[in-house]
Each structure stands twice: as structure tokens, then as C-alpha cells.
Amino acid sequence: MDYSVLEDFEHALSKYTGSPWVILTDSCTHAIELCLRYLKYDGPIILPNRTYLSVPMLIHKLGLQLYYDKDYEWKYEYRLAPTNVWDSARALDRKMFVNGRMQCLSFGPGKRLEIGRGGAILTDSRNDYYILKTMANDGRRLHISPWQDQQFFSLGFHYNMRLEEAVRGMEMLKNKELKDKKSQLVKYPNLLNITIEG
């Protein structure tokens, strides 16, 4: 098994979602982090007050101001306003991609394509694809083998999808082993009632 399985899964997701470019990651939260770091966004972030806890934790980790919009009702995906980054962890669907967005998917427990762990970024920019893919893979360019032959490294993170997960995801997508879309309508707790310390 080699890195070509990652590109195979990227192509399968591209065809399924309608996104021209797909970057695989180890989680949706890390996909969101990569997008915000890549955009060098340093302003405030507005989230719905009901979402999974890892997203406000990430905003705190990045040192960004966080505000909650208690009137923001969402299904399947929401925007990290005012950016073009979307938490699409529960939105995986055929032809779901919207141009101009960076939509971040999850393949974790309970998600439509439940690989076990993993995420992806959908984008319409080839440049974004190459930079984000390098960032997700320790600053490595995966076509250079062995990696020790690479001379220049941009800042990278160990947020890559494992090869085994890509193979499993591709098989599940091909066999249409997706959970029912309605199973993705989850009631999250009110995050206005929590405090993040540290």
C-alpha cells in the first residue's frame, strides 16, 4: 500500500461531492484548523451556540475571539463567520460542494461515512489544495520519496489521514455504506453555558 490510495480516495470524494479538489486529514477539527491557519485569519469567529465542543476549543487554542450566535439554527453544516470555512462534519452528500467555500468533513463515529477517524477539506482552488495537503502532511510533498530527499519544508502539521482509513473510506463510499442523512440531525448542548479555561 502506498500514498496513491490517498489520491484515489480524494478523487472518489471529489466525484461524489462535486468538489474539484479534496484534501484528506485525520479529523474535521484539524481540517478547520488547517483552513484558518492557511487563511492567516486573526479576527473574531462567530459560531452557532449549539455545535460540537472541539470547534470552540480550537478557536480558543488559536487565540481567536469567539462569539456565539444564539439565533443561528443550522442543519448538517454551518459557517465559521465571517470566513469561508464551513464545519460540514454532518453534511456529506452527493454534489454538496458550494464554490467559494472550504467545507470540512468528518468520517468519525456517528458520521455518514463512518470510517472511524478522518476528515477532509473540499475546495475549488488548486493552489489551496497543494498548500493545505502539504500542511496536513508534516510539510511534506508526498510525491517526493523518500521524504528525506525533500530540501524545503513549509510549516506542516501531523494531521494526515492514515492509508488504511483511506482504503476503508473508498470501499465504503463505493459500496454506498453511508448512514441515513436524517441520522445527522443531532441536538448539541448550549455552549453559552460552558467556560473554557487554560
What is each stretch, according to the model?
Residues 13, 31, 45, 63, ...:
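Generic structural signal for small/hydrophobic residues in well-ordered secondary structure
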Residues 20, 43, 80-82, 101, ...:
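Short coil/turn segments at beta-strand junctions that form active-site/ligand-binding loops
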Residues 7-45, 55-62:
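Phosphate-binding glycine-rich loop
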Residues 94, 102-198:
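Active-site region of PLP-dependent enzymes
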Residues 24, 68, 104-106:
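Structural signal for conserved beta-strand scaffold positions within catalytic alpha/beta enzyme cores
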Residues 3, 26-29, 49, 126:
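Alpha-helix N-cap/helix-start capping motif
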Residues 36-95:
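PLP-dependent aminotransferase-like
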Residues 1-11, 72, 171-173:
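A structural motif shared across PLP-dependent enzymes of the aminotransferase-like
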